[in-house]
Amino acid sequence: KPDTTQTTEFNGNVSTSNLDLGKLTGASSLGRISFAAKVKGNSDKNSNISAFTDATINQLDAYKYTYSNIKINGNLTKSTYIGSIFLDDPNCKLNFLGKLDFADKIPVFDFTALVPKIDFLKLHLNTIDSISQASFLFTAKFSGNNLYNSKGEIKIVNSSYKNQNGEFKLSDI
């Protein structure tokens, strides 16, 4: 019996080693990526996609730094991501859980990101200070894509920043 919805289902494993992501995307800030992923989902003739992925990124070069130990587990559509991202890199620890929704004209964000350690200097994200480290808990529940149409709440709690001048504990924002 023919498939009148023209839906394609997929279920399998995808992996790559040292794929030049920068060359593939034209983004000069990106380099090579190595990953393995289990993916299960479907797509239709209108390029709508719905997939569950469980991925481990062993290497991701970005801004002349090689990130390691990234795990992604969640549901992805053409315009949304609901799930978790766990980063256990020596210079950046991150636990992300939540939803990013770009389905409407105004995007919607609802997530928590715990960053117990980030070293901006070693990640090449700060080139001014000789020391640049932070830790914080970031929660967001808002919609918007600029300052004028944003509505909701963003909180930064238990945050600290350290540079060559000392360590600064920040009040909850």
Give the role of each language-model region.
Residues 1-173:
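Interface amphipathic segments
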